[in-house]
Amino acid sequence: MRILGIETSCDETGVAIFDDEQGLLSHELYSQVKLHADYGGVVPELASRDHVKKTIPLIKEALKKAGLTPADLDGIAYTAGPGLVGALLVGATIGRSLAYSWGLPAVAVHHMEGHLLAPMLEDNAPDFPFVALLVSGGHTMMVEVQGIGEYQILGESVDDAAGEAFDKTAKLMGLDYPGGPLLSKLAEKGTKGRFKFPRPMTDRPGLDFSFSGLKTFAANTIRANDDDEQTRADIAFAFQEAVVDTLAIKCKRALKQTGLKRLVIAGGVSANSYLRQELGSLMTKLNGEVFYPRTEFCTDNGAMIAYAGMQRLKNQELMDLSVKAYPRWPIDQLKPLNK
């Protein structure tokens, strides 16, 4: 089965073709970072218009690189939510329209299910069940995964997502957009121990997260200290350390609560090298395993949508002809396969 995947939930246009026997045949990605940089964040209207311009050319390029024609495809998968409603409607409209004109089945894919299943694209893919930490600019949640569609949310952010906290703190430090990766780069020059940030919501039971207070703590720390390069690096290190420690503490709790030994980390923040280092160390101590997507599949991409959509289409999940987008779509409302 060969599936065309389309991802347009935010500020990246992703298109890919996945074959259930040969694996990933092609993968195209266009980032809108430069388009939104002057605004310091994603402008929904600009994002939608750019998806309109880029999606069809990327589909043509993906087919060309895979050496395929539309007649060689078995289905189309598109991100239907959660995300920016205008951006989602672009991908959904194109996906449904092409499916109708090419005589193919189409399926709407949950964006976070795509992230959760992204490690399945790797040679060393995790077996079910596992605990998944989905950590990105828009979401931070802990999920117990028994199978595809069998998701129980164990905890989630009550305010800012981890990636959002990274970007907002980077902005406070005067770093360019998108600031999260730049803050992490600056933290590499930082000194451990000079500043101590709190580990929010780790002093009480539960698996929910809160990162807005860290942003406020960072703002106060920045104002109270000199603006030299080393101080900035030390603050960046302390902030990143606090976020990662908090995530690690919650992961350890989730694994203990569920009795599972496999941990999946996915979403944009899963590309963070310090996070990978610390959670890798944690799982070694716990005699467990940790799984990540390759770095290029941590951010939004069409490959994860093609893979997730393939699983749904194999299960005979088809959508009606209407074009629908779901800006808010709880992942635990998805249907398990074959149920």
From Swiss-Prot:
Reactions catalysed according to its record: L-threonylcarbamoyladenylate + adenosine(37) in tRNA = N(6)-L-threonylcarbamoyladenosine(37) in tRNA + AMP + H(+)
Main location: cytoplasm
A GO-annotated cellular component: cytoplasm
Keywords, ordered alphabetically: Acyltransferase, Cytoplasm, Iron, Metal-binding, Transferase, tRNA processing
Binding sites annotated in the UniProt record for substrate: L134, V135, S136, G137, G138, D167, G180, N272
Subcellular location: Cytoplasm
Gene Ontology biological process terms in this record: tRNA threonylcarbamoyladenosine modification
Cofactor: Fe(2+)
A single GO molecular function term of this UniProt record: iron ion binding
Transmembrane segments: none
Cofactor: binding details: Binds 1 Fe(2+) ion per subunit.
Lineage: superkingdom: Bacteria
A Pfam short name: TsaD
Its job: Required for the formation of a threonylcarbamoyl group on adenosine at position 37 (t(6)A37) in tRNAs that read codons beginning with adenine. Is involved in the transfer of the threonylcarbamoyl moiety of threonylcarbamoyl-AMP (TC-AMP) to the N6 group of A37, together with TsaE and TsaB. TsaD likely plays a direct catalytic role in this reaction.
Protein name: tRNA N6-adenosine threonylcarbamoyltransferase
Gene designation per UniProt: tsaD
